[in-house]
């Protein structure tokens, strides 16, 4: 998040969503996944002094110091390729509620050459429509996107909902890279 703070329950849900997505959208059979729960991941982060928790009247808050947050960008960039396509799909819904399936594929085709240049992405350009469809299937399977009427459109969850927050957080992972593409 922009202030490097998130409620404990929100973080648990976001971690679970990410684990579910990684199991459904497999980058490669060579990628190994830890057999950890969200609480295991949080505990490990605390042991590494990467995150800490404080008690707030509204519940526990997990936060990261500014110095640590800068270092964490290295780790984010190390694994971003695993979720780049689903996160790019999610990014297309940050501002809009609904998008035609064909338009979404066109947008991903438009940015894919830039993404491939910056990240270790294994797919060739001619394969990206199929990969985008796999990402869409994974995102609908975990409930952070749904099909509109007659399956011609994709629809994000209701604004303010837990699923909308998860979609926003996933999409935000690609925003810095997409901003660089736009500026360059």
Short names for language-model regions:
Residues 1-184:
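Membrane-interfacial terminal anchoring regions of lipid-handling membrane enzymes
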């Amino acid at each position: 998040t922009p202030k490097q703070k998130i409620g404990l329950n929100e973080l648990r849900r976001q971690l679970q969503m990410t684990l579910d997505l990684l199991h459904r959208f497999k980058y490669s059979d060579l990628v190994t996944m830890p057999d950890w729960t969200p609480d295991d991941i949080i505990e490990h982060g605390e042991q590494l002094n990467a995150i800490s928790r404080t008690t707030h009247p509204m519940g526990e808050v997990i936060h990261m110091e500014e110095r640590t947050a800068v270092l964490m960008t290295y780790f984010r960039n190390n694994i971003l390729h695993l979720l780049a396509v689903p996160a790019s799909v999610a990014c297309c819904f940050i501002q809009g509620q609904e998008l035609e399936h064909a338009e979404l594929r066109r947008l991903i085709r438009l940015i894919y050459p830039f993404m491939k240049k910056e990240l270790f992405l294994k797919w060739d350009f001619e394969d990206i429509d199929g990969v985008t469809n796999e990402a869409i299937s994974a995102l609908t399977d975990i409930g952070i996107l749904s099909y509109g009427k007659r399956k011609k459109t994709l629809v994000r969850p209701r604004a303010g909902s837990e699923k909308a927050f998860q979609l926003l957080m996933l999409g935000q992972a690609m925003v810095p890279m997409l901003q660089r593409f736009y500026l360059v």
